[in-house]
């Protein structure tokens, strides 16, 4: 709420040196009404990252607390109409619940075909000290029960992706 309120009341005269704003969002609240409430920053918002972490409704609603896949898809359609956006990154935190959906997630780029540059990025799940079941979820770790399957899926996935628009932080892991 703080950042939303900040953007809704943003006064360019107070921040004359800001030439661009990058937003990181899950896009569940990114409706036309919400975007219009921030009209004073439209020309500054050139880049956004949208955390999705799934390729299907079922998984999204499992890994995203209070996730609404249908609302997300509707909001992605709206985001695709925003003329000032130059860069959109869709992000996916790899975990035991979603690693089989990477290819489906990759296809979400096509929903943003009006944006000049759309990328996907795959992050390995990290332990920030608050997740009780980290070891159970961290499928990218070599001691995970599903690591061999994940590694095989990842190796096949790497063969079909465009490395100019798809990046990851799994270097040194596989």
Show the residue positions of the predicted features.
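Short beta-strand->alpha-helix junction loop in the catalytic core
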Residues: 26-29
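Structural motif corresponding to alpha-helix initiation and N-cap regions
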Residues: 31-35
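Radical SAM enzyme [4Fe-4S]-AdoMet core and its adjacent flexible, acidic
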Residues: 4-8, 13, 17-18, 36-174
């Amino acid at each position: 709420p703080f950042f939303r309120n900040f953007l809704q009341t943003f006064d360019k005269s107070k921040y004359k040196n800001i030439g661009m704003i990058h937003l990181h969002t899950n896009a569940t609240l990114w409706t036309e009404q919400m975007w219009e409430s921030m009209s004073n920053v439209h020309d500054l918002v050139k880049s956004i990252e949208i955390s999705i972490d799934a390729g299907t409704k079922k998984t999204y609603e499992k890994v995203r607390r209070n996730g609404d896949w249908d609302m997300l898809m509707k909001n992605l359609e709206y985001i695709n109409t925003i003329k000032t956006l130059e860069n959109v990154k869709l992000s996916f935190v790899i975990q035991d619940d979603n690693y089989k959906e990477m290819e489906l997630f990759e296809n979400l780029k096509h929903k943003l075909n009006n944006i000049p540059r759309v990328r996907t990025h795959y992050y390995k799940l990290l332990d920030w000290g608050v997740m009780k079941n980290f070891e159970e979820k961290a499928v990218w770790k070599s001691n995970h029960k599903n690591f061999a399957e994940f590694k095989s899926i990842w190796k096949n996935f790497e063969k079909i992706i465009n490395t100019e628009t798809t990046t990851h932080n799994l270097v040194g892991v596989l």
